[in-house]
Amino acid sequence: MAAPDNANQSLVVTAFWEVTPGEEAAVAGLLKEFLPQAQREPGVKEFQIHQNLAEPRKYFFYEVFAGEAAFADHQQTAHFKNIIVGQAVPKLAKRERSQFRFI
């Protein structure tokens, strides 16, 4: 599958989360609240959150933004600050993020 014409300007962000034992239900609820809001942001091309079938405390995020400015805007939204930073991150045992560009 070929990358879209404007893909070289896009920013791809991946994240891996591992939830602290006992916080699974709380984090799942927060992510269900957060996801539709993130998907509606103007600079978001794609935003998916996946839960590991074998290890349900682990999540994989796949996010595609129109560019670095759109990612910066995403991090300044009220839903990111309140739900992710304020509520979900404190319930994590581990959080890793990486940024990529299409080639």
Indicate residue ranges for each PLM-predicted region.
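N-terminal first-folded block
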Residues: 7-39
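Short, well-ordered beta-strand segments in beta-rich or mixed alpha/beta enzyme
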Residues: 11-18, 48-75
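An amphipathic, aromatic/His-enriched active-site/gating alpha helix that lines ligand/cofactor pockets
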Residues: 39-45, 64-98
